[in-house]
Amino acid sequence: MKSGIHPEYVTTQVNCGCGNSFTTRSTRTSGQITVEICSNCHPFYTGKQKILDTGGRVARFEARYGRRKK
């Protein structure tokens, strides 16, 4: 491997909008990253995600192609 071509890999503090913070490693030289959503407040990870049948698309698909057999 060539020397001197790889970026410096430093410890970085990640701060979320919900107040959660954690430490990781990154090539970002400032040592700080601010994010809006993390795994503590994202609906997918918190279990608050809702799957909506928008406009009957699932029902229309099932009517065309039939229900999937389990």
From Swiss-Prot:
<feature type="binding site">
    <location>
        <position position="41"/>
    </location>
    <ligand>
        <name>Zn(2+)</name>
    </ligand>
</feature>
<dbReference type="Pfam" id="PF01197">
    <property type="entry name" value="Ribosomal_L31"/>
</dbReference>
<keyword id="KW-0689">Ribosomal protein</keyword>
<keyword id="KW-0687">Ribonucleoprotein</keyword>
<feature type="binding site">
    <location>
        <position position="38"/>
    </location>
    <ligand>
        <name>Zn(2+)</name>
    </ligand>
</feature>
<keyword id="KW-0862">Zinc</keyword>
<dbReference type="GO" id="GO:0046872">
    <property type="term" value="F:metal ion binding"/>
</dbReference>
<dbReference type="GO" id="GO:0005840">
    <property type="term" value="C:ribosome"/>
</dbReference>
<dbReference type="InterPro" id="IPR034704">
    <property type="entry name" value="Ribosomal_bL28/bL31-like_sf"/>
</dbReference>
<feature type="binding site">
    <location>
        <position position="16"/>
    </location>
    <ligand>
        <name>Zn(2+)</name>
    </ligand>
</feature>
<feature type="binding site">
    <location>
        <position position="18"/>
    </location>
    <ligand>
        <name>Zn(2+)</name>
    </ligand>
</feature>
<keyword id="KW-0479">Metal-binding</keyword>
<comment type="subunit">
    <text>Part of the 50S ribosomal subunit.</text>
</comment>
<dbReference type="GO" id="GO:0006412">
    <property type="term" value="P:translation"/>
</dbReference>
<comment type="function">
    <text>Binds the 23S rRNA.</text>
</comment>
<keyword id="KW-0699">rRNA-binding</keyword>
<dbReference type="GO" id="GO:1990904">
    <property type="term" value="C:ribonucleoprotein complex"/>
</dbReference>
<comment type="similarity">
    <text>Belongs to the bacterial ribosomal protein bL31 family. Type A subfamily.</text>
</comment>
<dbReference type="InterPro" id="IPR042105">
    <property type="entry name" value="Ribosomal_bL31_sf"/>
</dbReference>
<dbReference type="InterPro" id="IPR027491">
    <property type="entry name" value="Ribosomal_bL31_A"/>
</dbReference>
<dbReference type="GO" id="GO:0003735">
    <property type="term" value="F:structural constituent of ribosome"/>
</dbReference>
<keyword id="KW-0694">RNA-binding</keyword>
<dbReference type="GO" id="GO:0019843">
    <property type="term" value="F:rRNA binding"/>
</dbReference>
<protein>
    <recommendedName>
        <fullName>Large ribosomal subunit protein bL31</fullName>
    </recommendedName>
</protein>
<dbReference type="InterPro" id="IPR002150">
    <property type="entry name" value="Ribosomal_bL31"/>
</dbReference>
